[in-house]
Amino acid sequence: MSASPTARQAITQALPMITRKVVISDPIQMPEVYSSTPGGTLYSTTPGGTKLIYERAFMKNLRGSPLSQTPPSNVPSCLLRGTPRTPFRKCVPVPTELIKQTKSLKIEDQEQFQLDL
């Protein structure tokens, strides 16, 4: 087993999940995104099979947090909203020395190998 003792202990002390049944009589009542529900709760799973449940109130709280209002630190400034547009750089011609070097390189073709099955 790869789970640590504290992880195993947390699994054994899991709280019962409160569920509620919503009857949908018309396909129009189905949400646009199938991982969400009519009540606004989002359900997801990890590749390992862990079920994630995000309630609507929790997600709305995250939306207004200061962390969600700040942009990531590694985004170029030209992609940030509200920055003035800068013109694209004009294409600079390739130096002739570089063209001569690439022409002088000779790529030798090798015969295709046989694969025995």
UniProtKB/Swiss-Prot annotation:
One of its GO terms (biological process) is vascular endothelial growth factor receptor signaling pathway. Changing Y54 to E/F: Abolished interaction with eIF4E1. One of its GO terms (molecular function) is eukaryotic initiation factor 4E binding. Changing T37A: Decreased phosphorylation in response. Phosphorylation at Thr-37, Thr-46, Ser-65 and Thr-70, corresponding to the hyperphosphorylated form, impairs its ability to prevent the interaction between eIF4G1 and eIF4E1, without affecting its interaction with free eIF4E1. Phosphorylated in rtesponse to insulin. Phosphorylation at Thr-46 is regulated by Tor and constitutes the major phosphorylation event that regulates activity. Widely expressed. It comes from Drosophila melanogaster. A motif (YXXXXLphi motif) lies at residues 54-60. Repressor of translation initiation that regulates eIF4E1 activity by preventing its assembly into the eIF4F complex. Hypophosphorylated form competes with eIF4G1 and strongly binds to eIF4E1, leading to repress translation. In contrast, hyperphosphorylated form dissociates from eIF4E1, allowing interaction between eIF4G1 and eIF4E1, leading to initiation of translation. Acts as a regulator of various biological processes, such as innate immunity, cell growth or synaptic transmission. Acts downstream of phosphoinositide-3-kinase (PI3K) to regulate cell growth. The modification Phosphoserine is found at S65. GO terms for cellular component: cytoplasm; cytosol; glutamatergic synapse; neuromuscular junction; presynapse. This is Eukaryotic translation initiation factor 4E-binding protein. Hypophosphorylated Thor/4E-BP competes with eIF4G1 to interact with eIF4E1; insulin stimulated Akt1 or Tor phosphorylation of Thor/4E-BP causes dissociation of the complex allowing eIF4G1 to bind and consequent initiation of translation. The modification Phosphothreonine is found at T37, T46, T70. Keywords: Immunity, Innate immunity, Phosphoprotein, Protein synthesis inhibitor, Translation regulation. The YXXXXLphi motif mediates interaction with eIF4E1. Compared to other members of the family this YXXXXLphi is atypical and interaction with eIF4E1 is weaker.
